[in-house]
Amino acid sequence: MNADELILQALREDITSEDITTNSVMPHDQAGEVDLICKQDGVIAGLEVFKRVFELLDEKTEVVFYCKDGDTVKKGEKIGLVRGDIRVLLSGERTALNYLQRMSGIATYTREIADLLKGTKTKLLDTRKTTPNMRIFEKYSVKVGGGYNHRYNLSDGILLKDNHIGAAGGVKEAVRMAKEYAPFVRKIEIEVENLDMLKDALEAGADIIMLDNMTVEDMKKAVELCRGKAETECSGNVTRENVARLVDIGVDYISSGALTHSSPILDLSLKNLHAI
């Protein structure tokens, strides 16, 4: 499903048959314009999605921006203008803002953590813990904020987690079967919870070791054991407060589901609507 189809689905969810409030008080074909205002500091992401909401309602709608995705914006700043049929402006307002606020919130939170990794080898990754039918938008927002995308979907790579390992009969057996099934160029990543599992994964030839909810001391030992043999990824309970400590340990990647499932929105609004 492409972006336009997802946006149209969101519009149908909100408008259904008609915007009865707007249609009851606004005449047809009355032109107007409204300002896009920031209500808090943050990083903007999703401007083209915001614009597309109005264009899909009426292709004649004009949307002007005074910033671009990835820019830092300030509270009270006017960052855009929407001009067109007032009915369209009112009916599309909520859907357009929902996208822009959600995407900008993810970009803002990602930027806060990514900035803590500047100057280090460690890369910040997202996960598949995304909102249904929002993955394309949420993962884009992570990239805008300075993070990197892990797997976009289940076809993108092999990641053996606890349930895969249990069903396969153990770490070594899971890696062996994955290697037999996967093309040679595909890396095999496996999640481990302790050093014994880690040693089995290395013996089996895993390419990336995900250290899941391990203690700091065990992670230090794990990184040493993996040096020159496999890349390391830290996952689980990643916060702004503990990122520096994880970087010091020397992991190659830090993955965080919180980038997409727990980022607060960036407060934005459409204000000063008037007829023209």
Where are these predicted regions, by residue range?
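Acidic/glycine-rich phosphate/pyrophosphate-binding loops and surrounding catalytic core
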Residues: M1-A204, I208, K220-L225, A230-C234, ...
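Short secondary-structure boundary segments
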Residues: N213, G236, G257-A258
